[in-house]
């Protein structure tokens, strides 16, 4: 499990997906700087990559190949993937722009990156998608971004999630603001995602806003 603590990334291990997770040596896998939002991606050739966010001239998404033991990155492979540069990604026109929360999936010959932009406290926090032919890019942001925002979810602060499949259906689980007037405590939501071909015969995500719903914990 890759996680963030005190703006550093670490890896913990477990024999079961439900834990407990432990670290033999409690230290970050990247020695310098500040990093958040790790996502471990294993490609079809079994190479392991760490997509993550570096706090440098804004929140920017990077990739690096992981060492075989997961306890560090191969520094020479570090490369920036993308940063906020379009209007929807910086609706508040701030100098410290934000692109974060990367999730990577491969469909056919293309890599898809779901990412979020704007500060998470901004009602316009939203999800965009970029594609690449190679895991190191270049990454091209799709026309139609953002694909998930308060405009089709009905909730402010919709973003920073993960993609998973149940049966034949894909879903995206993400944060939202507590309400359209309060940011915290943030809530968790789920929304079905379909992939449809656009005019260029490229698969693009289609979020079903009518089925967007908040997840609630059961009392036990």
Label each PLM-derived region with a short phrase:
Residues 1-220:
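Carbohydrate-active catalytic/glycan-binding domains of CAZyme proteins
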């Amino acid at each position: 499990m890759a996680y963030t603590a005190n703006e550093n990334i670490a890896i913990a291990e477990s024999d079961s997906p439900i834990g407990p997770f432990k670290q033999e040596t409690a230290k970050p896998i990247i020695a310098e700087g500040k990093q958040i939002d790790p996502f471990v991606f294993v490609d079809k050739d079994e190479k392991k990559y760490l997509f993550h966010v570096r706090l440098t001239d804004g929140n920017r998404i990077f990739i690096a190949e992981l060492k075989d033991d997961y306890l560090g990155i191969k520094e020479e492979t570090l490369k920036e993937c993308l940063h906020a540069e379009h209007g929807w990604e910086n609706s508040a026109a701030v100098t410290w722009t934000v692109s974060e929360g990367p999730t990577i999936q491969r469909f056919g010959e293309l890599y898809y990156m779901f990412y979020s932009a704007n500060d998470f406290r901004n009602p316009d926090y939203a999800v965009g998608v970029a594609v690449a032919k190679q895991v190191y890019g270049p990454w091209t942001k799709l026309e139609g971004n953002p694909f998930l925002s308060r405009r089709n979810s009905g909730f402010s602060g919709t973003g920073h999630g993960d993609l998973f499949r149940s049966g034949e259906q894909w879903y995206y689980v993400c944060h939202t603001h507590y309400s359209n007037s309060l940011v915290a405590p943030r809530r968790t939501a789920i929304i079905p995602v379909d992939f449809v071909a656009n005019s260029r015969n490229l698969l693009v995500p289609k979020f079903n806003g009518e089925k967007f719903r908040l997840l609630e914990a059961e009392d036990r």
